[in-house]
UniProtKB/Swiss-Prot annotation:
It is an enzyme of class 2 (transferase). Changing C185 to A/S: Loss of octanoyl transferase activity. One of its GO terms (biological process) is positive regulation of oxygen metabolic process. Substrate binds at R85, G86, G87, L88, A89, T90, F91, H92, A154, I155, G156, G167, L168, A169. It comes from Mus musculus (Mouse). Keywords: Acyltransferase, Ligase, Mitochondrion, Transferase, Transit peptide. One of its GO terms (cellular component) is mitochondrion. One of its GO terms (molecular function) is lipoyl(octanoyl) transferase activity. The keyword GTP-binding does not apply. This is Octanoyl-[acyl-carrier-protein]:protein N-octanoyltransferase LIPT2, mitochondrial. Catalyzes the transfer of endogenously produced octanoic acid from octanoyl-acyl-carrier-protein onto the lipoyl domains of lipoate-dependent enzymes such as the protein H of the glycine cleavage system (GCSH). Lipoyl-ACP can also act as a substrate although octanoyl-ACP is likely to be the physiological substrate. InterPro entries: aa-tRNA-synth_II/BPL/LPL, BPL_LPL_catalytic, Octanoyltransferase. The active site is at C185.
Length: 231
């Protein structure tokens, strides 16, 4: 039996707004097709991957940022955006691998809960491939992947009509001081870390990408195909 096919779109370093616009484009395409899988042959959706070009704080469905917080964060030179994903406030920026899978869960045999678990397993597997054996997922409200008491990968998703959006953010060489201006994901008393900090050397998004794609294919049990046009 052939594996579901997911289209891979590597955007490189782009502004967060460009990622959201492309995500919305693919959401409309997949949700408009009443028969799963017929839009693009056997494709189960698209995997949008990028490195954010600038600092941006985002709020989720469980809570955003107050007007006062928004003003303060923008004064730091960061963009502030409300999103439709689950979770609370977090940070995205250069040195971070940002992955938004826009997938038809029916074609992957997944439900929302198992989709989130697969994203966590993908990040854990990536850490293992990079030589970090202690990464683990934790139950809500600690959704994501952790090294000890520090989160290395944040996860927040949305799902409507079986189609997912948003996804995971893995800190590779992220400037972690940006997280000091918020309570990441609303979790008081916890910290954040990165692959660079854990491995004590510079680990770039470009270096991590091959391991990430291996981990994604393993955990989602799919085939990835790369195409030139993102749309």
């Amino acid at each position: 039996m052939s594996l579901p096919v997911v289209r891979l779109v590597w955007l490189g370093r782009v502004h967060y707004s460009e990622l959201l616009a492309l995500q919305e484009h693919w959401l409309r395409r997949l949700q408009a097709d009443p028969r799963p899988g017929t839009l693009s042959g056997t494709k189960a959706g698209v995997l949008l991957v990028c490195e954010p070009a600038g600092p941006v704080y985002t709020g989720g469905l469980r809570g955003g940022l107050t007007p006062e917080e928004t003003t303060r964060l923008r004064a730091l030179g960061a963009e502030v955006r409300a999103t439709g994903r689950g979770g609370l406030a977090t940070f995205h920026g250069p040195g971070q691998l940002l992955c938004h899978p826009v997938l038809d869960l029916r074609l992957l045999g997944l439900r929302l809960r198992t989709h989130v678990a697969a994203l966590e397993a993908c990040a854990v597997r990536l850490c293992e491939l990079r030589g970090l054996q202690g990464a683990r997922a934790r139950p809500p409200p600690y959704t994501g992947v952790w090294l000890g008491e520090r989160k290395i990968c944040a996860i927040g998703v949305r799902c409507g009509r079986h189609i997912t959006s948003h996804g995971l953010a893995l800190n590779c060489s992220t400037d972690l001081t940006w997280f000091e201006h918020i309570v990441p994901c609303g979790l008081v008393g916890t910290g954040v870390t990165s692959l660079s900090e854990a491995l004590q050397r510079l680990v770039t998004v470009d270096e991590v990408m091959p391991s990430f794609l291996v981990a994604f294919k393993e955990t989602f049990k799919c085939t990835l195909i790369s195409e030139d046009s993102p749309s």
